[in-house]
Amino acid sequence: DLVRSRGLGDVYKRQERYLHLLSRGDKIGLTLIRLSIAIVFMWIGLLKFVPYEADSITPFVANSPLMSFFYEHPEDYKQHLTHEGEYKPEARAWQTANNTYGFSNGLGVVEVIIALLVLANPVNRWLGLLGGLMAFTTPLVTLSFLITTPEAWVPALGDAHHGFPYLSGAGRLVLKDTLMLAGAVMIMADSARDILKQRSNESSSTLKTEY
């Protein structure tokens, strides 16, 4: 029994060490969240300058009451859609006339700026806070696509499983933006906490100087 008790005690101590180690991972986790958000916005933002990526967001933009006005002919998008890797000159010409690529380029610039602001947090917390706010706002718009975009749901092509709650591939990608939303809240809170801490330190230094 004594040997068994000692063995259990050793296991308990090892668990304690691992738990203490994991409990200190919040700062590392925040850094990883910040880097992940920056990577996603930077990578996808740069892809917005490539025609296939611009083409892929056409259904979302064309059906969105917040964005469709950026397109010249949003109501005609379905007959001009292409698959990734597919090249159709007539579809490409329509997308050009539709301002698909002009809008996508502008969106790409915004997304790259968000990534840079998020990465700027160690240098300037206010820039990091702004980046977090923009990263938070973006998923609010994209998640609305689940309501406005028919292509977000499995179409009725004969299978019994279609419509709500059966998300299509596009819908499943949009749903993952809930993680972006939560991550943005975390990095905003982290930046705000650091700003308040800096202000507190400055106030303390000022009081010490006065007295």
Feature map (PLM): residue ranges:
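Single conserved hydrophobic/aromatic residue that forms the stacking wall/gate
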Residues: D1-Y12
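Membrane-interfacial, low-structure loops and terminal tails that flank and connect transmembrane helices
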Residues: D10-K27, Q198-Y211
